[in-house]
């Protein structure tokens, strides 16, 4: 009988463990460290750091932002988009 392929293969688990060991780093909330109370939609330099190249909001699991600040961040980005301070997609140039 040939070895299992696809999602039941054992090679996938070992490969995933090797990758996670290479890129493991401690994530921290930028807003907690700097002592920010509220995230402002007019602070475009900060907001651009949390928007990807394609215009999507970067998730908290990648940035390490706490849930409290992630909610504020998404509303601030959406407000900035509505006021045309930030683009909705990567097709628009700033």
UniProtKB/Swiss-Prot annotation:
What PANTHER family does the record tag this protein with? 30S RIBOSOMAL PROTEIN S18 (PTHR13479), SMALL RIBOSOMAL SUBUNIT PROTEIN BS18M (PTHR13479:SF40)
Summarize the protein's role. Answer: Binds as a heterodimer with protein bS6 to the central domain of the 16S rRNA, where it helps stabilize the platform of the 30S subunit.
GO MF annotation: an example: structural constituent of ribosome
SUPFAM superfamilies in alphabetical order? Ribosomal protein S18
UniProt family annotation: Belongs to the bacterial ribosomal protein bS18 family.
GO cellular-component terms in the record? Answer: cytosolic small ribosomal subunit
- One Pfam family assigned to this protein is Ribosomal_S18
Q: Which GO terms describe its biological process?
A: translation
Subunit note: Part of the 30S ribosomal subunit. Forms a tight heterodimer with protein bS6.
Q: What is this protein called?
A: Small ribosomal subunit protein bS18
The signal sequence is: none
Q: Which keywords fit this entry according to its UniProt record?
A: Ribonucleoprotein, Ribosomal protein, RNA-binding, rRNA-binding
Source organism, top-level taxon = Bacteria
């Amino acid at each position: 009988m040939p070895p299992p392929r696809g999602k039941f293969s054992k090679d996938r688990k070992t490969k995933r463990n090797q990758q996670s060991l290479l890129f493991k780093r401690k994530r921290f909330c930028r807003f907690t460290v700097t002592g920010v109370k509220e995230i402002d939609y007019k602070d475009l330099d900060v907001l651009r750091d949390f928007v990807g190249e394609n215009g999507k909001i970067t998730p908290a699991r990648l940035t390490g932002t706490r849930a409290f600040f992630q909610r504020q961040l998404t509303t601030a980005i959406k407000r900035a988009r509505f006021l045309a301070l930030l683009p909705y997609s990567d097709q628009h140039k700033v």
